[in-house]
Amino acid sequence: ANLDDPHSLHRLKGLAGTVIHLAPPPSDGTIDRRTRHLAAILPRHGTVVYVSTTGVYGDCGGASFDETRPVAPANARAVRRVDAERVLRRWARRAQARLAILRVPGIYAGDRLPLERLKQGTPALRPEDDVYTNHIHADDLAAIVARAIFHGAPQRVYHTVDDSDMMMGEYFDAVA
């Protein structure tokens, strides 16, 4: 099946009561056509876990915040993620279904580290340009997805971050 081709999805309709939606939005436009195509085949009374991004909040200026902060996407990709969240919320209401939205920061794992950037000597951030950042290990994210499937409260947004309060420069130092 191909989320860019809605006809290819019809054969999947009704096959799964639980769906984990990890696909990124398309690279252009202001709507997430892929999520719209997926929502059209999702089952009534189903469960969906959508892996979104903390990027939907835009630039928070280093402030700490929780899931109640209004979204303020600052780039087209984040706008498409907000669109996907709204599409899935509408589906969940209409289908009397369970939806967990996981807002995820940078994902890291052994094969997902900025090693090439470090090997190439790409300059890191100057202290005056540094920003706070959060990350999550891929294994921790997988465990949270499983927990959201079985124990997540319906129609909830969850921040899935490591809560490290680390500057981006410190992150690069730790990786190095």
Predicted features, each with a name:
Residues 142-176:
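Mid/C-terminal beta-alpha module of Rossmann-like enzyme folds, strongest
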Residues 37-76:
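Conserved Rossmann-fold NAD(P)-dependent oxidoreductase catalytic core, especially the SDR/UDP-sugar
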Residues 86-110:
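Conserved beta-loop-beta element that borders a ligand/cofactor-binding pocket
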Residues 107-117, 126-149:
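Substrate-positioning beta->alpha
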Residues 12-51, 83-87:
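NAD(P)-cofactor binding segment of oxidoreductase domains
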